[in-house]
A protein has these predicted regions:
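Class I SAM-dependent methyltransferase SAM/SAH-binding core
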Residues: 34-36, 40-90
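Short glycine-dipeptide loop
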Residues: 53-54, 126-131
Length: 196
């Protein structure tokens, strides 16, 4: 199912988005990385290869089915990834646990109040100088019907960057990933920042 989703749904754009997310995060061997809204764990699998055996990868998602699939994928690949059910506004980890926190295509599901709570939690679990990379859909103004309801909490990259800045993060950068012409992919953007 993930293969179909990655390969055909958006003409491989999701794979490119995940790769760019990991690259922007400057993940290194031995890093501890948290994937917030990990879904079925595809990004976490790539991150596990990047951090090596000396690193740590954890993923949380509120979906029980997604976490079950992620655990199966990790077991099949013998990847030591900790997947658990959880929500961004109440991360089940001690303070200053992670070098990097990633979130891909998840923030658009949340209202602004939960985004703020979630960013405060990310700040709490990141080590000083830790890196945050958020990738999410852009161009919410063009969505209509069911897509508009699905992306009800969507925001522009500038709005998301402002929330990240308000949460106390430094050295903010944004980047846009334009969809190919005639693609169903709505376009995405990245917000990268560091914990003070």
């Amino acid at each position: 199912m993930e293969w179909f989703f990655d390969t055909f749904l958006f003409c491989g754009q999701l794979r490119e988005l995940r790769q760019r997310t990991a690259t922007l995060a400057r993940i290194q061997l031995g890093d501890a990385v948290l994937d917030v809204g990990c879904g079925t764990g595809t990004l976490a699998m790539d991150v596990a290869r990047r951090v090596g055996r000396a690193g740590r990868v954890a993923g949380i998602d509120p979906g029980t089915e997604q976490i079950a699939r992620a655990r199966k994928k990790a077991a099949w690949r013998h990847a030591p990834i900790e997947f658990q059910i959880g929500v961004i506004e109440q991360l089940p980890f001690p303070d200053q646990t992670f070098d990097v926190v990633l979130s891909t295509l998840m923030m658009h599901h949340l209202p602004a109040s939960l985004k703020r709570q979630g960013l405060a939690e990310i700040d709490r679990v990141l080590k000083p100088g830790g890196r945050l990379v958020i990738a999410d859909f852009t161009r919410k103004q063009e969505r209509t019907g069911q897509a508009a309801r699905f992306h009800a909490g969507g925001s522009s990259m500038q709005d998301l960057a402002a929330l990240v800045s308000d949460a106390g993060f430094d050295h903010l950068e944004t980047e846009e990933m334009r969809p190919p012409r005639f693609s169903a992919f709505p376009g995405a953007g990245f917000v990268c920042a560091y914990k003070s």
